């Protein structure tokens, strides 16, 4: 499941003169003890994005997960793209969260880089679930227009791909339009991305899920050496 999303990202990154990077075998593909859960990861970079990672978790009919995070290079104050998609096969429920995760909460910055999400939410009302906004910290790395969907099989089959393609394409378009920083300099951007990784490594809700499937040692290594690699960096 979700191969079309991964392939779309790969093509989009290649169009930016990007490339796939080699990662360690234990992160490329890892199985839990009875192989009921399999995790696969990919890592890309381009001149515009220092790190663009993709994760797929295959739990068969019970659970399917897709996650991607894009980090612009330190010369760009653009937000970090984040997407989490979970399909619970037993209950036939879809949970998805898409956001352009801002480096700062300044009003002008948010409007310039994140407000186009509002257009997507209005076009696809299923991704405008205000009742679930308590699941994130709005004062940290989330925009006021974070897109949240709690849907069903119809939303999975009919809506998800179209929304995801628009979400990614619009992110790339906005970042291409904003070549000159107005709010942050290089060192500030780097420090904000370090803060983001430290915050995410501590707060990531997938931590418990991964530990239950793959054990604590592998999960800690995965979080620090693949997901949030700036977690152990010191700020300048």
From Swiss-Prot:
Q: What does this protein do?
A: Catalyzes the two-electron reduction of biliverdin IX-alpha at the C15 methine bridge.
Question: Could you give a single Gene Ontology term from the biological process aspect?
Answer: phytochromobilin biosynthetic process
Top EC class per UniProt? oxidoreductase
| EC identifiers of the protein | 1.3.7.2
Q: Which reaction does it catalyse?
A: 15,16-dihydrobiliverdin + oxidized 2[4Fe-4S]-[ferredoxin] = biliverdin IXalpha + reduced 2[4Fe-4S]-[ferredoxin] + 2 H(+)
| Signal peptide residue numbers | none
- HAMAP family from the entry? PebA (MF_00792)
Top-rank taxon, per record: Bacteria
Q: Tell me a Gene Ontology molecular-function term this record carries.
A: 15,16-dihydrobiliverdin:ferredoxin oxidoreductase activity
Q: Report which gene this protein is encoded by.
A: pebA
| Pfam families documented for this protein | Fe_bilin_red (PF05996)
The name on file for this protein is 15,16-dihydrobiliverdin:ferredoxin oxidoreductase
Could you tell me which InterPro entries the record lists for this protein? DiHydbiliverdin_OxRdtase, Ferredoxin-dep_bilin_Rdtase
Protein family according to the UniProt entry: Belongs to the HY2 family.
Q: Is Oxidoreductase a UniProt keyword of this protein?
A: yes
UniProt entry keywords in alphabetical sequence: Oxidoreductase
């Amino acid at each position: 499941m979700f191969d079309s999303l991964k392939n779309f990202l790969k093509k989009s990154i290649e169009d930016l003169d990007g490339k796939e990077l080699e990662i360690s075998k234990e992160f490329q593909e890892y199985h839990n003890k009875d192989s009921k859960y399999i995790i696969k990861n990919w890592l890309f970079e381009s001149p515009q994005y220092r790190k663009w990672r993709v994760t797929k978790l295959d739990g068969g009919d019970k659970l399917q997960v897709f996650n991607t995070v894009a980090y612009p290079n330190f010369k760009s104050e653009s937000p970090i793209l984040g997407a989490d998609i979970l399909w619970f096969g037993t209950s036939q429920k879809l949970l998805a969260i898409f956001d352009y995760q801002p480096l700062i909460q300044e009003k002008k910055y948010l409007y310039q880089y994140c407000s186009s999400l509002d257009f997507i939410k209005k076009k696809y009302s299923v991704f405008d679930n205000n009742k679930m906004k308590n699941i994130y910290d709005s004062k940290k790395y989330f925009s006021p227009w974070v897109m949240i969907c709690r849907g069903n099989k119809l939303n999975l089959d009919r809506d998800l791909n179209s929304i995801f393609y628009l979400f990614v394409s619009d992110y790339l378009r906005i970042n291409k339009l904003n070549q000159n920083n107005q709010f942050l300099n290089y060192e500030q951007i780097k420090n904000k991305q370090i803060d983001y990784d430290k915050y995410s490594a501590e707060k990531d809700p997938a931590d418990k899920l991964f530990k239950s499937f793959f054990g604590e040692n592998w999960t800690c290594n995965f979080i620090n050496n693949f997901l949030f690699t700036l977690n152990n960096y010191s700020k300048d």
